[in-house]
Every structure is written in structure tokens, then in C-alpha cells.
């Protein structure tokens, strides 16, 4: 499960960059740039990918070379959905997809954080999850603020629903796969 999530974490800054490249709204652009900055940080080693690698270190997993044949179908579909929807030129699609990912992520990182705590991992092992609990909620709230300026525009809500439902369904599939995987291997 950790390897699958690593693949998602690796791709996320690039998906945000795709959203930035297709944005023509200053408020959304500002939010996306702040989001990307929180992902990559000022210094290598303090970016979210490096922090996640610390977590993998505690699990004794080496993901320095992700192996595509180890990725679940659900992981690949989630990545493609984020890539396609974040870089969509329609503001509604982009915002729906971004909100789906950020709001679900806040709940899921909290669950991982709680599970790691219960299983006795040291605090520095799950720092990635600790910092994301509040950050993801802030990002989701920022996206909703932008939506407030657009929701009355023609077709905005329909397009928002398209982006939201596509990414959300891929997230649900991903987390259901993770849950069933955990059950199969008796990992708790």
C-alpha cells in the first residue's frame, strides 16, 4: 500500500503544475502556486516526496526505482484521472477534480496517521501524514472559495460534477483496493 501511495505522491506536484499551466484565473492560480509550493518546498529534503521517502525508510521499503509492474490498476487510473482533469481547460472540471482529491486526502491521511500511531511507529516515521492532515483541509477550503465566484456561470456545476465524480470514483477504487489488499495480507 505504501508503494502505491508513493506513486501518487510522486505524480501530484506535476498534476498541480498541469493545473497551473491551464489556469486563467488569478485567484485559482495563486492557490495552485501555494499548493505546489507546499508540495515541493524551498529545499530538497523538505519537500513532500522526501518526507514520504522517510516514511518508506521506516517501513524498510526502497522505492528509489518505482516498478510499473508493481502498480495496481487502480493506482494507474487515479494518476491518469488527476492528470487529465487537473490540466482540463474548463474551470469547473479542474476545480471539481482538485476538490475531490484534496478533501478525500485529508480524511485518508488522518486514517493512516491514526493507524500508524496505534501500531507504535515513532512520530518522525509518519511526519508526512501529520503535516497533511491540516494542509489538505486548507487546500480544499481554498478551492471552495474559488468555486463561490463561478457557481452561477452556465454549466459550471455540471462541469464541476464531472471533475469531482471522475477523480472521486478513482480515489474510492484506489482506497477500496488498499483496504482489500490489507485484508488479504492481514496487514494492520
Describe the residue ranges of each PLM region:
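Non-heme di-metal
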Residues: 1-188
